[in-house]
Regions:
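Active-site-proximal specificity loops/subdomain of glycosyltransferases
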Residues: 101-171, 436-494
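Catalytic core and acceptor-binding pocket of nucleotide-sugar-dependent glycosyltransferases
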Residues: 239-335, 520, 535, 542-680
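Short, well-formed alpha-helical segments that are part of the catalytic scaffolds
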Residues: 72-85, 412-425
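C-terminal, non-catalytic tails of nucleotide-sugar-dependent glycosyltransferases
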Residues: 305, 334-382
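N-terminal signal-anchor transmembrane helix specifying type II single-pass membrane topology
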Residues: 1-46
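Short, acidic, metal-binding catalytic loop of nucleotide-sugar glycosyltransferases
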Residues: 81-94, 102-104, 422-430
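GT-A fold catalytic core of metal-dependent nucleotide-sugar glycosyltransferases
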Residues: 167-175, 180-210, 220-222, 480-537, ...
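A conserved hydrophobic helix/loop-capping motif in glycosyltransferases and polysaccharide synthases
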Residues: 63-72, 404-409
């Protein structure tokens, strides 16, 4: 690409970047979906996590350095010199220099040309020969050296993608572009990080895909937070990849390569709503960039990158923004950042400075902070299997002593995922998921969601030996209901008010904002309750349970009655002729009847009983338009909740078509959120 083309591409990218309003900061620190059960697990839970959750054995740590070069000889000399002068502590380190192929300007303008007549007099090939002569003669004393001169021009996307395939779980790749300069301490530092966070089981987490030497330069999501790390240690985790010296871990990189090949074979694009990477795809540089693909993959898998928190003028790697390069001035993020941002006056850390700033101190992983693409802190691993663990989680999610609890038991994984993406779009992130013990639910905790596992162990703790006499054929469903009720009871005893909803109840609006401040003033209109109404609405939509002594008393009596009823075949006299006989629906009807019989106000609020009010509307899946053509004349904006009852008995394609037509389908073909939202 000539200088004129490069500047046009940079200008276009910068204009799009500024117009979209994304938060760029130089770092200063103080389709058709296959929804079968096996595909759900495969798509939602990364294979490396489901196959192994333990650290690799520290047998033979090995690093291969991959230098990506094209047409900048002076840059390459500076980069290789800094690598050669680094301290490797006597380790054997491989060096691979990957030189992209030079092509004539004319052939770049004519992609139909398959055979090119090369002329030694052209500046392009002349520069290539000069670079090749230099790298051939470059002395590397720390291990084997290999030079790869591409037979075809790959550009930065191809150079990065095809740079490495790990030979084993102990091989790590350190990839640098030719305009990066390294500190003498970079290898010792990376080895220390890998030793601490890859080989020590207590610090190992399969969600970590690598280590970046640079200070993060960009929050790629619209409306993202400033790049401010509120941590005392030297390290933090951030989802964004950094390419001013990036160490890659073997397992996540293999996953990425396989995923990338699959996407390219299907002619897919790395679209992710709310991200600056979408604007890059529309620029002259878009097809040459690999970062949009990797960002999409990281979002899909929920992976993170280790970063180093240094002083504003210190660095383990420096990017020099040299003109030229393989695709217009380097590969990190896009050229506009390099050309327009005011880079700090960085200096490479010396040995003495490393001692003064405690560079070698590695905190336990549990003390390190995690940040997503919005640079919003993520609380990973919030999973409760006991009442004590539940108490700790509630303190992290409560808002004004109120907790939103979401029952996801027996709800299909893709329905739960769609609900989560919808909540993100509404700005709701503080809630607790109640789930059965399956890999998908546990993986949600790894991704930062608060999860309570309704397991046999928890049922024993909450219900004691009383549950042992329940008919085994009914035990699972009824036990999950009883544990749910007991979890709510535990939350009430801890002093919190409760909103209780279901993951198969789609919220069209933020109902906490609409009704949150009104619930304590609302009273149940007994005359307006029709006991023959659709019973699902009493537990699948939205319940509000205030905190009072009377409520706790009623809740305990409800569980006790159902334990007794579950042990016998006698019908519950309170349910009478109501059109429900057993299961969780009966629980909520029982509670409703008990509250109506009581003379005291037990603090029970059920939004479904207020359907007579025009400002509340709950509909079912069949009420949604069947396709987009019908949807043009239909609106769900006046609806508050869409109940997805009976999804398991319907064709997934029909459900998806209806939700999509109503604007309620928020996940893509890989069951990942289509859009990233950074609302507070």
């Amino acid at each position: 690409m000539g200088a004129r083309g490069w500047f046009i591409g940079v200008a276009a990218a910068l204009l799009l970047f500024v117009m979209t309003g994304y938060h760029m900061v130089i770092c200063r620190f103080p389709g058709t979906h296959k929804l079968e059960a096996d595909n759900i697990s495969r798509l939602l839970v990364p294979s490396s996590l489901s196959s192994s959750s333990s650290a690799a054995k520290p047998q033979k740590f090995g690093m291969v350095i991959k230098v990506l070069a094209f047409n900048r000889l002076e840059s390459l000399i500076r980069c290789l010199t800094s690598l050669a002068n680094a301290d490797y502590g006597g380790d054997t380190v491989k060096l691979h220099i990957l030189v992209d192929h030079f092509r004539f300007e004319s052939s770049e303008l004519d992609p139909s040309t398959e055979e090119e007549e090369e002329d030694d007099s052209t500046p392009e090939e002349g520069g290539a020969h000069e670079i090749l002569m230099y790298v051939d003669g470059f002395k590397w004393q720390h291990g084997p050296k290999e030079v790869h001169y591409r037979s075809k021009k790959l550009g930065l996307q191809g150079q990065w993608i095809e740079a490495w395939w790990p030979s084993n779980d102990d091989e790590f790749a350190f990839i640098v572009e030719d305009d990066v300069e390294l500190s003498r301490l970079f290898y010792r530092y990376l080895r220390g990080v890998v030793s601490t966070y890859y080989y020590k089981p207590q610090n190992y987490d399969p969600s970590i895909y690598g280590v970046s030497l640079q200070c993060p330069q960009l929050v790629p999501s619209k409306g993202g937070l400033p790049l401010v790390v509120n941590a005392t240690g030297n390290l933090f985790l951030y989802q964004m990849v950094g390419t001013w010296g990036q160490l890659l871990f073997p397992r996540p990189w293999k996953e990425f390569r396989i995923w990338y090949d699959k996407c390219k074979s299907k002619d897919m694009r790395p679209f992710l709503g709310g991200m600056v990477t979408n604007t890059w795809n529309n620029t002259q540089l878009g097809e040459q960039m690999w970062t949009p693909w990797f960002v999409k993959f990281i979002h899909l898998r929920g992976y993170f990158n280790l970063y180093t928190k240094l002083q504003s003028d210190q660095a383990l790697s420096i990017l020099h923004r040299d003109h030229g390069g393989d695709g217009g001035g380097g590969g990190h993020v896009n050229a506009s950042i390099k050309s327009a941002a005011a880079e700090p006056n960085l200096k490479l850390i010396s040995v003495d400075e490393a001692i003064n700033i405690s560079l070698w101190e590695m905190e336990p992983l549990k003390l390190i902070k995690w940040y997503d693409f919005c640079f919003r802190e993520v609380k990973v691993g919030r999973i409760a299997n006991t009442v004590a663990e539940l108490s700790g989680i509630l303190r992290l999610v409560e808002v004004n002593k109120t907790v939103l609890m979401v029952n996801a038991v027996h709800v299909q994984g893709w329905v739960v995922q769609n609900w989560l993406c919808q909540m993100q779009s509404l700005g709701l992130r503080n809630f607790v998921l109640l789930g059965d013990d399956r890999p998908f639910v546990r993986d949600l905790a790894r991704r930062g969601h608060a999860v309570v596992i309704l397991s046999a162990a928890l049922s024993t703790e909450l219900l004691g030996q009383e549950i042992s006499g329940i008919d085994i054929m009914r035990e699972d469903d009824l036990r999950q209901d009883l544990i749910t009720m007991q979890v709510v009871d535990a939350v009430l005893h801890l002093g919190y008010r409760v909103w209780l909803t279901r993951a198969d109840a789609m919220w069209v609006h933020n109902l906490l904002s609409l009704f949150g401040n009104k619930m304590e003033q609302l009273k149940v209109d007994v005359a307006g309750i029709e006991l023959t109404r659709d019973h699902h609405r009493f537990h699948r939509s939205l319940l509000y349970i205030s905190n009072s002594n009377a409520t706790v008393h009623l809740w305990g009596k409800l569980v006790k009655d159902f334990l007794e009823a579950a042990k016998s075949d006698a019908p519950d006299p309170d349910l009478g002729q109501l059109p429900i006989m057993q299961g969780e629906s009966a629980l909520w009807w029982k509670f409703l009847l008990m509250s109506l019989k009581s003379e005291a106000d037990f603090g029970y609020r059920d939004l479904s009983t207020m359907l007579v009010q025009p400002d509340l509307m709950i509909i079912g899946l069949d009420d949604l338009p069947p396709n987009r053509r019908v949807a043009m004349n239909t609106s769900v904006t006046n609806t508050h909740i869409v109940l997805l009852d009976g999804v398991a008995r319907r064709k997934p394609s029909d459900v998806i078509q209806r939700l999509n037509a109503a604007g309620l389908w928020f996940i893509d073909k890989e069951l990942s959120c289509k859009h990233i939202h950074c609302q507070p």
